[in-house]
């Protein structure tokens, strides 16, 4: 939890909010931050924490106040950082209890169900001092922030196991997710394209790599030499853009090189990024400097599919399928010793998209 981290100078366009996984999740936040978050100027009912759009939260705390109304309970929940009002709707009794049962057996069953329901309600009744978990949407009522619950329940936690687990979990979630500013890759790409001269060398290299990937996919290129990419006008214009130099790296000498040498270097680095993602690869250790596009190498797809299909017939792989590392080892033995994990992962995803193979569990694949 960082003071002032909920403020964001410029809101991300609401059309891009769906790219942030926090937007669709029940965010586990401290109550203090829920109370301090600023409401979006674009969409009422959506709040911003460090640029992350949040409309649903998950809180765990102690009940410090109870008010009952005809349709709902109002619980004051305290997690030691703040207190927030939670509106928890009563369950509607849809069964008609006034209808007279037609037989003694039905009378007995009805009375037993009624007693069971009363017992459950009595044991789950929430009172001051109880621990409660609430998941719901954030609302503002009479200028006070509150949570309208979609689900809530009393937590049986006599030795504080659940509360301690939450206390240990939240700092990690904040550090890895909430305190990392939300930046949409689509927005960054749009900004970069509109003003490529404002990029440093790594950012320009990354952008060139993305544009090269789009070019290869749109034109269904099967293989290429680096020099061929350097002749594509749109890519060449992008590579020729000036860059912001970093004084603490070797980038300061980038523009001192000859233009052709600098362009060759940035294209080489951009292709290397594609190789690291498994989108392109080289055969025979790259002696001929020819790159192959993973998506278009049908022969590689067929061989990987055959490995999975054949090994899944063996007794030790029939139930769960073949593990990723087993497929990788077989592929390196029968196809190419230098096959990378990234390339294999790309091939497996393509085969799965085509329904040639199925993922039975994490990292396990089978073919029919």
From Swiss-Prot:
It is found in: Nucleus; Chromosome, Telomere. GO terms for molecular function: single-stranded telomeric DNA binding. Residues 1-185 are annotated as: Interaction with CTC1. Residues 57-155 bind DNA. InterPro entries: CST_STN1_C (IPR015253), CST_Stn1_wHTH1_sf (IPR042082), NA-bd_OB-fold (IPR012340), RFA2-like (IPR040260), Stn1 (IPR014647), Stn1_N (IPR018856), WH-like_DNA-bd_sf (IPR036388), WH_DNA-bd_sf (IPR036390). Component of the CST complex proposed to act as a specialized replication factor promoting DNA replication under conditions of replication stress or natural replication barriers such as the telomere duplex. The CST complex binds single-stranded DNA with high affinity in a sequence-independent manner, while isolated subunits bind DNA with low affinity by themselves. Initially the CST complex has been proposed to protect telomeres from DNA degradation. However, the CST complex has been shown to be involved in several aspects of telomere replication. This is CST complex subunit STN1. It comes from Macaca fascicularis (Crab-eating macaque). The gene is STN1.
């Amino acid at each position: 939890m960082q003071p002032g981290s909920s403020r964001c100078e410029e809101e991300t366009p609401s059309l891009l909010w769906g790219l942030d996984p926090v937007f669709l999740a029940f965010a586990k936040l401290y109550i203090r931050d829920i109370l301090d978050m600023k409401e979006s100027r674009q969409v009422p009912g959506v709040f911003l924490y460090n640029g992350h759009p949040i409309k649903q939260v998950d809180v765990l705390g102690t009940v410090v106040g109870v008010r009952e109304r005809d349709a709902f309970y109002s619980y004051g929940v305290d997690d030691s950082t703040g207190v927030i009002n939670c509106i928890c709707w009563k369950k509607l009794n849809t069964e008609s209890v006034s209808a007279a049962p037609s037989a003694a057996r039905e009378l007995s069953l009805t009375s037993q169900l009624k007693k069971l329901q009363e017992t459950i309600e009595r044991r789950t009744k929430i009172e001051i001092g109880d621990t409660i978990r609430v998941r719901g949407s954030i609302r503002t009522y009479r200028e006070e922030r509150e949570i309208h619950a979609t689900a809530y329940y009393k937590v049986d936690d006599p030795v504080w196991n659940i509360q301690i687990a939450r206390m240990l979990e939240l700092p990690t979630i904040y550090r890895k997710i909430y305190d990392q500013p939300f930046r949409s890759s689509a927005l960054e790409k749009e900004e970069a394209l509109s003003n490529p001269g404002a990029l440093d060398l790594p950012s320009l290299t990354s952008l060139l790599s993305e544009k090269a990937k789009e070019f290869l996919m749109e034109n269904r290129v099967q293989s290429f030499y680096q020099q061929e990419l350097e002749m594509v006008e749109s890519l060449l214009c992008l590579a020729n853009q000036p860059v912001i130099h970093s004084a603490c790296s070797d980038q300061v000498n980038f523009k001192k090189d000859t233009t052709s040498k600098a362009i060759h270097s940035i294209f080489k680095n951009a292709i290397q990024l594609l190789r690291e993602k498994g989108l392109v690869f080289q055969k025979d250790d790259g002696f001929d400097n020819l790159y192959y596009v993973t998506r278009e190498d049908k022969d590689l797809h067929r061989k990987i599919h055959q490995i999975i299909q054949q090994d899944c017939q063996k007794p030790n792989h029939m139930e769960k399928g073949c593990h990723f590392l087993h497929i990788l080892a077989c592929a390196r033995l029968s196809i190419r010793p230098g096959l990378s994990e990234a390339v294999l992962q790309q091939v497996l995803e393509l085969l799965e998209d085509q329904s040639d193979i199925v993922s039975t569990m994490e990292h396990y694949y089978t073919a029919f």
